[in-house]
Regions:
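Conserved phosphate/ATP/ADP-binding segment of small-molecule kinases
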Residues: 73-154
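Short pre-catalytic strand/loop immediately N-terminal to key active-site residues, enriched for Gly-Thr
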Residues: 157-169
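Short, well-structured alpha-helical segments that form the helix of a local strand-helix-strand
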Residues: 127-132, 189-204, 224-225
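Active-site cofactor/substrate anionic-group-binding motifs, chiefly glycine-
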Residues: 7-51
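Single conserved hydrophobic/aromatic residue that forms the stacking wall/gate
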Residues: 1-5, 9, 233-241
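Charged C-terminal helix
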Residues: 202-236
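Short, small-residue alpha-helix embedded
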Residues: 166-198
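Glycine/small-residue-rich loop that forms an oxyanion/phosphate-binding "nest" at active or ligand-binding sites
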Residues: 52-81, 87
């Protein structure tokens, strides 16, 4: 239901504690992104999460930079304890931090030592399944090779371009889009999460195809956004999963 997702993906953004409950009530899905943390935004995240759970809305946690600081790690872990999430979406370092309670993340990017590769793929799959079972929700680990698991099944997705890692915000964009896909397909959450990852990867490939000599990563970012906007035209493009 990609067309339904496009209708859902009309977002409202708020981090003010007095505002988030009302905004959450009129939205079909909640994406909690911890990219900007302070006392006020943290309070707003917990309030929004509680309201979304009350209403039975789909919820997603994007633990941006978890492992880079104690505040980020502790906030993400506490959110997992107090809010019922349908999906946790992050890079491998962020997700490992949630699983272990500490990490080696030096920012919002995954540590090279943690990367999922063809050589350690089986280990990565086992980790994704185990953490999904422990967390009680779908886990989407994104990187050069993407893993999406509900604890029983694990989708392995190889779409995308290495240059996507040089653009700040592609992961956050994916989390927003994934929330919309889940809100449009609440009975097929695992498939919706995997479809969002495939769509983002395809957008990266399609966008790269329009790059010209002299274009840089700012242009590429906009090409990706354009490709997502035009995704219904390219919906028949093959995915590798």
């Amino acid at each position: 239901k990609s067309s339904a997702a496009s209708d859902v993906y009309k977002r409202q953004m708020s981090d003010e504690p007095e505002d988030v409950k009302e905004i959450t009530s009129i939205c079909q899905g909640l994406n909690i992104n911890i990219g900007t943390l302070n006392k006020r935004t943290i309070e707003g995240m917990f309030a929004a999460g509680a309201r979304a759970n009350e209403l039975g809305h789909v919820t997603l946690l994007d633990p941006v930079g978890a492992g880079a600081s104690g505040l980020r790690t502790n906030t993400a872990v506490e959110l997992m304890e107090k809010v019922r999430f349908d999906v946790i979406r992050g890079n491998i370092s962020e997700v490992k931090t949630l699983a272990q309670g500490s990490g080696t993340t030096k920012g919002v990017d995954a540590d090279v030592a943690d990367a999922v590769t063809e050589e350690n793929l089986e280990e990565g799959i086992a980790f994704a399944k185990a953490f999904a079972k422990k967390a009680g929700c779908i886990v989407a680990i994104t990187g050069a090779i993407d893993l999406v698991s509900d604890g029983a099944t694990c989708y392995i997705i190889r779409n995308g371009r290495p240059e996507m890692g040089k653009i700040t915000g592609t992961g956050c964009q994916l989390s927003g889009m994934m929330t919309a896909f889940l809100a449009a397909n609440p009975e097929q959450k695992l498939e919706a999460a995997a479809a969002a990852v495939c769509t983002m990867g395809l957008a990266g490939e399609i966008g790269w195809g329009y790059m010209q000599k002299g274009d840089g990563n700012a242009t590429y970012r906009n090409r990706i956004i354009d490709a997502i906007y035009l995704s219904l035209i390219h919906i028949s493009e093959p995915t590798r999963h």
